[in-house]
UniProtKB/Swiss-Prot annotation:
Primary location class: cytoplasm
Subcellular location: Cytoplasm
PROSITE patterns per record: G_TR_1 (PS00301), G_TR_2 (PS51722)
GO BP annotations listed: adhesion of symbiont to host epithelial cell; positive regulation of interleukin-8 production; symbiont-mediated perturbation of host cellular process
Keyword Methyltransferase: no
Name of this protein: Elongation factor Tu
InterPro entries with a match to the protein in the record: EF-Tu_GTP-bd, EF-Tu_GTPase, EFTu-like_2, EFTU_2, G_TR_CS, P-loop_NTPase, Small_GTP-bd, T_Tr_GTP-bd_dom
Phylogenetic placement of the source organism: Bacteria, Bacillati, Bacillota, Bacilli, Lactobacillales
Molecular function terms, GO-annotated: GTP binding; GTPase activity; translation elongation factor activity
Gene designation per UniProt: tuf
UniProt-listed SUPFAM superfamilies: EF-Tu/eEF-1alpha/eIF2-gamma C-terminal domain, P-loop containing nucleoside triphosphate hydrolases, Translation proteins
Chain residue ranges for the region called G2: 61-65
Organism: Lactobacillus johnsonii (strain CNCM I-12250 / La1 / NCC 533)
One Pfam match: GTP_EFTU
């Protein structure tokens, strides 16, 4: 790890991503952004197939995994996540969307808003993505400019429906494919898009002063060095020599010391809230840490099984349930980076919950999870998202 190039923190760092309906051009836009910025010396061009990297997608052209690319504008350093578009893989968006300070919503002018457009806006709202910039894609394929105006109005209305400022959200029109193919006019549109992202999505106020917390996304072993846990730092900071606890999924809390830190395959002196990092842990075996746990400052977070949550239950049109549910319903609760089954107890006087309802209820999980007031989660059943919410009270 030591001999790697050093990651220099010069420009402010922002996490963004592309969201929107399958085949509307999210990955093409991501490729176009890196290609245009590479011409300006601010990025390495990533082609579509590099971003679209998971092997099982190739046959169907559907993005499954979450791709991270990095690039710079004149003002900022960006980590850009290409969120999966296909409903089957919405689970990955849930882990991914939580990593975004802002999002570029891609809507094909040929189609207008589609079911997943709505689902992604809802999820963005629930996982705390505060700012959305709209890219109306494929405008070269629409002959009538009034149709494009109509699509823009539809998108603005949809954003307003989910408490985004639909009237004020910036909307950029262009063709990602034409920009990727080198059309100078469309390349300028991409530059304009990134200027807009620079201006409209504020540099996030990081939670660097709070105690360190990092949900574990992945675990791997470096031969001769030890076990690395990787993920996005939720809050606080971490550096080599810090003591950390591994919390969640079991009652036992493992203690360790950070012996190495890297970001984008470069060593890092200090990891801060918002950074995607790999943390090398002293004396920890591969089987002592797993996805779904958290690394945390000692004593800062505990595991719990019982909590109250405020939850929005998706309606049928959003891809949710078609029927109500009752007390004793046992779906999956997706916390941080993993699913845990939980039993729902509805409040007194509430006999059932209908799709589209907003409700507070009590949950008992089958495994202890590192949670606290404000921790966000989604509720899933049979591979699809049926609700989203956050912890309002810890009960144990």
């Amino acid at each position: 790890m030591a001999e790697k190039e050093h990651y220099e923190r010069t420009k402010p760092h922002v996490n963004i991503g592309t969201i929107g309906h399958v085949d509307h051009g999210k990955t093409t836009l991501t490729a176009a952004i890196t290609t245009v910025l590479a011409e300006d010396g601010l990025a390495q061009a990533e082609d579509y197939s590099q971003i679209d990297a998971a092997p099982e997608e190739k046959e169907r052209g559907i993005t499954i995994n979450t791709a991270h690319v990095e690039y710079e504008t004149k003002n900022r350093h960006y980590a850009h996540m290409d969120a999966p578009g296909h409903a089957d893989y919405i689970k990955n968006m849930i882990t991914g969307a939580a990593q975004m300070d802002g999002a570029i919503l891609v809507v094909a002018a040929t189609d207008g808003p589609m079911p997943q457009t709505r689902e992604h806006i809802l999820l963005a709202r629930q996982v705390g993505v505060q700012y959305i910039v709209v890219f109306l894609n494929k405008v070269d394929l629409v002959d009538d400019p009034e149709l494009i105006d109509l699509v823009e109005m539809e998108v603005r209305d949809l954003l307003s429906e989910y408490d985004y400022p639909g009237d004020d959200v910036p909307v950029i029109r262009g063709s990602a494919l034409k920009a990727l193919e080198g059309d100078p006019e469309q390349q300028d549109v991409i530059r304009k898009l990134m200027e807009t992202v620079d201006e409209y999505i504020p540099t996030p106020e990081r939670d660097t002063d709070k105690p360190f917390l990092m949900p574990v996304e992945d675990v791997f072993t470096i031969t001769g060095r030890g076990t690395v846990a990787s993920g996005r730092i939720d809050r606080g900071t971490v550096k080599v020599g810090d003591e950390v606890e591994i919390v969640g999924l079991t009652d036992k809390i493992e203690k360790s010391t950070v012996t190495g830190l890297e970001m984008f395959h470069k060593t890092l002196d200090l990891g801060e809230a918002g950074d995607n990092v790999g943390v090398l842990l002293r004396g920890i075996d591969r089987d002592q840490v797993e996805r779904g746990q958290v690394l945390a400052a000692p004593g800062s977070i505990q595991t719990h099984k019982n909590f109250k949550g405020q939850v929005y239950i998706l309606n049928k049109d959003e891809g949710g349930r078609h029927t109500p549910f009752f007390s004793d319903y046992r779906p999956q609760f997706y916390f941080h980076t993993t699913d845990v089954t939980g039993k729902i107890e509805l409040p007194e006087g509430t006999e059932m919950v209908m799709p589209g309802d907003n409700v507070e209820f009590t949950v008992e999980l089958i495994k202890p999870v590192a949670i606290e007031k404000g921790t966000k989660f989604t509720i899933r059943e049979g591979g699809k998202t049926v609700g989203a919410g956050q912890v309002t009270e810890i009960l144990d």
